[in-house]
Amino acid sequence: MPIFFYLFATLITISSVCVVLSKNSVYSVLWLIFAFINGAGLMILLGAEFLAMMLIVIYVGAVAVLFLFVIMMLDMHFNKTITQLKANLALSIFIALIMFADLVIIILLGTKNINFNSNVSFTITNNISNTKAIGGVLYTDFMLPFQMAGLILFVAMIACITLTLKKREGVKRQDISKQLRHNKENTVLMTKPILNKGVENIKYE
């Protein structure tokens, strides 16, 4: 069992690094799918088959595939993105150094000073399935973090929608409120043209 743990953990680490370093967003999503699959393998080793199935069905089958289609449909200019990243290179390096320092501190100090909540029990027996045990802990002891996670996902969904709202020049769009305000006084114009002459000085909206 330890050899499988180290195998899945190593593959997750490699795929996570490739997600960040890949220049093509499509390749990043494919590496992310690979990381989710290895994460499901770790869940199986822990005896949580339900979580492993949810990782495959929801994250790989729905979320990651949705990311893939959204990236493929968006008109993303990679050269422009690289230019923007170079403009914020100093800030990016500073944040990366802070995160790296946090990881070093955690590795050196370990988890000795972390007080775990001993009141939270997560026991799986023959009478209680892992689905029931996870649901009992998730919706009782961790109800507030669960709601916050849902709120974060909701904000991320709104952000994905706003990415598709690009204003393009020369594209005519419908103004529903303006159409509903129209009546016969401002849409129908009665005129009497002169014989053999066209109608001039008419403004169209």
Swiss-Prot record:
GO-annotated cellular components: plasma membrane
Keywords recorded for this protein, A-Z: Cell membrane, Membrane, NAD, Quinone, Translocase, Transmembrane, Transmembrane helix
Membrane topology: Multi-pass membrane protein
GO molecular function: NADH dehydrogenase (ubiquinone) activity; quinone binding
EC number(s) on file: 7.1.1.-
Compartment(s) of residence: Cell membrane
Transmembrane segments: 1-21, 26-46, 54-74, 89-109, 142-162
Family to which this protein belongs: Belongs to the complex I subunit 6 family.
Function: NDH-1 shuttles electrons from NADH, via FMN and iron-sulfur (Fe-S) centers, to quinones in the respiratory chain. Couples the redox reaction to proton translocation (for every two electrons transferred, four hydrogen ions are translocated across the cytoplasmic membrane), and thus conserves the redox energy in a proton gradient.
Protein name: NADH-quinone oxidoreductase subunit J
Gene: nuoJ
